[in-house]
């Protein structure tokens, strides 16, 4: 009996360490996923965006309201942000404000919160890009069947740009 107990204990230690990630690894992974998502957002690549969003996502925007499914969120994105090729919104995180907070259970990461501030720029055909405004964000990423997806999205404290300034 004791050899089986010892074997089971050793096996559980190895299994836990094999599946657990360090905070640094989780932070790097979430920053990478976040970067891919926002690159897709900036290019209106809705297929890539959709692949990083949970089916049961809840998105809360302090000016635009709430949407509570991936299908609803993507329909709004397609209609409001990606329907006019002569108008694009570009999102950029404010350097130094973005932080990732791993969420763990029994030492294994099951999620992470990424939070910070971001800027939004408008690109219109024939015009220079200009700053439209800024806001804060908090996103909950969850590990869902082996895949990291955004599950809860909060975009809040939106402010219009203090002055319209073209980006060089």
Task: Mark where each language-model region is.
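Short, low-complexity N-terminal intrinsically disordered segments enriched in polar/charged residues
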Residues: 2, 17-55, 166-168
